């Protein structure tokens, strides 16, 4: 039976060996490159694959269409995943007629998600296990095929439990793989009401909070003992790691974090005391507790703390979903210019943010919000401010793919909004000037203008209505459940990195990018319905400064507000935009590399956007809320924005084949 395998870690190695022993034909193995910052105590899937003569790959994004196509060409009958660390897209799972199966290190539906081995120890569980289940779109939610229980002994630590899980996994696979091959398995649906889900753990999560019971801290020590990074605390500014510990239930009463004795090294906790049996000062060597006390200069009555005594104010953690997009990458640049922000980002690409990837306060994961729900929920919980910037926001897609617009722009964002409600996190949500629709007011006002859209048979309005409904949902959560929020409405922001010329080639871009492509390729500039529609164009730098001030939220003035961010002085028709762009193009130093101007061509909107499109004649913002809440005023003239945007795109064009 032909299979494609996704695998990593010891579980990946034993899963591959079990498949081969059961007579499966492995066409390819997908794994990960090792993280140099991670202590690799486990077997190498890549090395095993090479030794067995099996093709092995470690793509950054296995869900990329190119990899999906390559996997499809392998024609797998069944797919297996053994501790592969990325979610696998449904498009891949559907390639195998017999389905896809994942090995998970817990007794599902308990402990779905990441690091179940560590979490069961943190939580003081006495039982865990391994589960083989069918893979579905939602992580770890498919029907259970086989399950094996394991007792957790009081003296088990992470590595001993890991070895138990590996032994159990071998047994389970040896019993179950032949049945899958024969098509003779019994599947049991998971009980959703019993499900629990946990996110990934980082070394920073393992600090010892001395106000907690000693038993809780002891479980933390067990969960992250060597070869994991270890639980830690501080003496002043000196960090030390606790590798093994013991609970003392009847210790003398003392302030939590106080040293009760140094031989043994006994620390008072919220309930009981924790004996530090072995530990390590800084990057030194492991030593027994009394020697550690001497090394750290501890005496009876000394106080420990959970963070450095001189720790600076914690940086505000900002989660940006869609960080590689136009607003996301410019906002990241603005935030990192300051020293008090930590930016966490998710997107399906990284070309626009490559300049930040090595920044110590920028953390990026390449992924799709529709399949990385576990990662998103964990980071919503972890961060202070959430900006869900992912959306389809190009007009041609509103008529071309209305359901996809609804699914991404509404359904996926609603899930994120609910996470913010659940974890009581501040959300800064990108509404849109499109919500005003065909409003006839001279200035579109956030608090008074009516939101007017066309009939249902005009799918062009699905983006506007999706955003408007989310605005209303957020407002209701704010009113009824105390959600801290700000809605901002961008009015035609433009500048470098707005879309790209490849998107413009398929019509999926904003106006100025499409016009620049026409100039670059020597094709006529198309003026939809004559190009008389007027817009107020806003420089990205002005827009980002306003958005930055919303994040800063001086005096909490932005809470519960809707804020237009636009430049009412930069009003121009699309035809006028084209003329200004042409004038800038003709005097650009790279002009001679490109074809002659092919003129303007008037086209009907239905022939360009398709059936169901309606346009808006004017869209001018009132910016009184921005002035009041942000003390903000747009400053940059439209011509300057046009010149810089054009220059950016012209310098991205490969000129080698345009030499005269």
UniProtKB/Swiss-Prot annotation:
Q: Transmembrane ranges?
A: none
Does the keyword Lipid biosynthesis belong to this entry?
yes
| Binding-site list for UDP-alpha-D-glucuronate | 393, 398, 432-433, 460, 492, 526-535, 613
Question: Where along the sequence does the record put site: Raises pKa of active site His?
Answer: 140
Segment Dehydrogenase ArnADH: which positions?
314-660
Please give the residue ranges the record annotates as the region Formyltransferase ArnAFT: 1-304
Work out whether the entry's keyword set contains Lipid biosynthesis: yes
User: Its domain of life?
Assistant: Bacteria
Sites where the protein binds (6R)-10-formyltetrahydrofolate: 86-88, 114, 136-140
| Any one Gene Ontology BP term | lipopolysaccharide biosynthetic process
Q: What does this protein do?
A: Bifunctional enzyme that catalyzes the oxidative decarboxylation of UDP-glucuronic acid (UDP-GlcUA) to UDP-4-keto-arabinose (UDP-Ara4O) and the addition of a formyl group to UDP-4-amino-4-deoxy-L-arabinose (UDP-L-Ara4N) to form UDP-L-4-formamido-arabinose (UDP-L-Ara4FN). The modified arabinose is attached to lipid A and is required for resistance to polymyxin and cationic antimicrobial peptides.
* HAMAP family hit by this protein: ArnA
Q: How does it assemble?
A: Homohexamer, formed by a dimer of trimers.
Q: What is the designated name of this protein?
A: Bifunctional polymyxin resistance protein ArnA
Its organism's taxonomic lineage begins at:
Bacteria, Pseudomonadati, Pseudomonadota, Gammaproteobacteria, Enterobacterales
């Amino acid at each position: 039976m032909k299979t494609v395998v996704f695998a990593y870690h010891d579980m990946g190695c034993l899963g591959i060996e079990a498949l081969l022993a059961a007579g499966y034909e492995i066409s390819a193995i997908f794994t990960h490159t090792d993280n140099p910052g991670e202590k690799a105590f486990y077997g190498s899937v890549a090395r095993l694959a090479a030794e067995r003569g099996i093709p092995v790959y470690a793509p950054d994004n296995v869900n990329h269409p190119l990899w999906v196509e390559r996997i499809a060409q392998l024609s797998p009958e069944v797919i297996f995943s053994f501790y592969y660390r990325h979610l696998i897209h449904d498009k891949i799972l559907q390639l195998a007629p017999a389905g896809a199966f994942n090995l998970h290190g817990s007794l599902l539906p308990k402990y779905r998600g990441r690091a179940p081995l560590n979490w069961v120890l943190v939580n003081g569980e006495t039982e865990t296990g391994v589960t083989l289940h069918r893979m579905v779109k939602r992580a770890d939610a498919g029907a259970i095929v086989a399950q094996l229980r394991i007792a957790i002994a009081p003296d088990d630590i992470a590595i001993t439990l890991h070895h138990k899980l590996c032994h159990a996994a071998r047994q389970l696979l040896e019993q179950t793989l032949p049945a899958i091959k024969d098509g003779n398995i019994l599947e049991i649906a998971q009980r959703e009401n019993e499900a629990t889900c946990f996110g990934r753990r980082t070394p920073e999560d393992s600090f010892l909070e001395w106000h907690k019971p000693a038993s809780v801290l002891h479980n933390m020590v067990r969960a992250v003992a060597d070869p994991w990074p270890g639980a830690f605390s501080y003496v002043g500014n000196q960090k030390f790691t606790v590798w093994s510990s013991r609970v003392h239930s009847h210790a003398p009463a003392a302030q939590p974090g106080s040293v009760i004795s140094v031989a043994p090294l006994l620390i008072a906790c919220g309930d009981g005391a924790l004996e530090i049996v072995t530990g390590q000062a800084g990057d030194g060597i492991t030593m027994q507790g009394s020697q550690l006390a001497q090394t750290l200069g501890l005496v009876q009555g000394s106080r420990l703390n959970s963070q450095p005594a001189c720790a600076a104010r914690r940086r505000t953690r900002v989660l940006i979903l869609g960080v590689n997009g136009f607003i996301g990458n410019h906002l990241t640049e603005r935030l990192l210019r300051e020293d008090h922000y930590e930016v966490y980002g998710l997107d399906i690409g990284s070309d626009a943010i490559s300049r930040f990837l090595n920044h110590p306060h920028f953390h990026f994961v390449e992924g799709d919000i529709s399949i990385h729900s576990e990662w998103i929920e964990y980071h919503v919980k972890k961060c202070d401010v959430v900006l869900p910037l992912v959306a389809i926001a190009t007009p041609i897609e509103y008529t071309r793919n209305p359901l996809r617009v609804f699914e991404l722009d509404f359904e996926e964002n609603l899930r994120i909004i609910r996470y913010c409600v659940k974890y009581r996190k501040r959300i800064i949500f990108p509404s849109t000037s499109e919500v005003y629709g065909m409003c006839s007011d001279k200035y579109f006002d956030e608090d008074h203008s009516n939101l007017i859209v066309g009939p249902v048979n005009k799918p062009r309005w699905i983006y506007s209505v999706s955003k408007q409904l989310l605005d209303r949902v957020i407002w209701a959560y704010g009113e009824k459940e105390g959600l801290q929020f700000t809605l901002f409405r961008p009015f035609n922001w433009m500048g470098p990195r707005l879309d790209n010329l490849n998107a413009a080639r398929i019509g999926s871009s904003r106006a100025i990018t499409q016009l620049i492509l026409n100039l670059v390729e020597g094709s006529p500039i198309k003026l939809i319905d004559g190009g008389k529609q007027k817009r107020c164009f806003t420089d990205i730098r002005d827009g980002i400064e306003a958005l930055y001030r919303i994040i800063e939220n001086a005096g909490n003035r932005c809470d519960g507000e809707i804020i237009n961010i636009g430049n009412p002085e930069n009003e121009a028709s699309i035809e006028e935009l084209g003329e200004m762009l042409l004038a800038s193009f003709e005097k650009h130093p790279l002009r001679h590399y490109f074809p002659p101007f092919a003129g303007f061509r008037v086209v009907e909107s239905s022939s360009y956007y398709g059936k169901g499109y309606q346009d808006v004649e004017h869209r001018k913002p009132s910016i009184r809320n921005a002035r009041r809440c942000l003390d903000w005023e747009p400053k940059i003239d439209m011509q300057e924005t046009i010149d810089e945007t054009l220059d950016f795109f012209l310098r991205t064009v490969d000129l080698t084949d345009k030499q005269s």
